[in-house]
Amino acid sequence: SNPERQAYVAALAAERESGSAASSNPDPVLSLEVGRKRLRDAGGAFLDEGQVWTASLSQTFEWPERLRLRRAIADRQIEAAKLGLGRFEQALEAKAAVLAYRLSRAQVRAQACEEVAARFAGLRKALVGRDPSGPAPTIELRSVEAAEVVARRRAEEARLALQQALLEMNQLRGAPSLAPLTVKAPVLALKDAPKLEELLAAAQQGNFSYRMHVLESEQLSLQSDLARSDSVPGFTAGPYVSQDRVGGRETIVGLRFDIPLPVSGRSSAAERSANERRRQSKSAISAAWRDVEKDLGQTWLSYASKVDQLRMHKDDPAVRFSEAAKLAESHFRAGALSLQLFMDAQAGYLEAVDSALLIQEQAVEAGFRLRELSGVPFNPVASR
């Protein structure tokens, strides 16, 4: 139901239709000429007048080698359209997975901010009933109010991010923009990436950008061969019949044969131009492969780094800091903890949530980016 995917499917269908006609000769041409003829003698005296007409049927024939080259060029265009569709479907799947993760994590982030804001609101109400004598109670109250404002702002930002992710997800699904959607927050286990050497080997066939450069080079090579074959062009042949009814009836039946003469040098110029473009495309292939090696190496290192960071903690640091934030509240209300430590615990909880979710999101994106760059069916996320 995704409209962009339908556009790629339509483009592939169009290339297939064009390819089906690439290896066939043009349609025959029927020509008809009709006129009148007036016959006079040498002195200008009128002798006779009547109708004349000519009809011909002609067919242009291409040499088999030229038809083969045209079909091969069309096959490369079809393969390029298939690659485009496959790349889009792969990117669509990856984007849907990342958006689903982002949607669930935005819910977690919003809940954490609202939880902290509620704690500060409860503490603010408790501080209002204290004896306001001296500057310390007032400063403490204002500090708590400021922290509550910051927590509510972050909660609002998290809710906005949630709505933005929802809009993007509904666009991908082809659903109404504000259609409700709930995604359960998964407990993720990130897989180890394949070895970099394996990814690079697979990228020679699986990387879209590199494959497109290779296909373009192959297509230009075929076009160069096609331009070279212009020195032996196709020919047109067919029967014709003409009739003249002036001064009697004269009928002529014959065979017509036409062949272009390559005397202008256009075919050789086209061949030289195609050869230059082919050499240029080979240089572009080398540059494209260097880009693949660089992007794949950087993404592989980034993914491995993020996975190592997440595996440093056996449990979710956000959960551990959440428990510490709750414990800090109970101890502060009991008078066993200072206000500063209480506020530090709440701020640390929010920072831990943001950091953990950000690293997880970056790891998921890097994992799917590895799949996009290499073409390996690697799913970085495994639900526990």
Regions found by a protein language model. Give the residues of each.
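Periplasmic alpha-helical coiled-coil/stalk elements that build and connect Gram-negative outer-membrane
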Residues: 85-206, 299-306, 349, 356, ...
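Acidic, low-complexity, intrinsically disordered peripheral segments
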Residues: 353-384
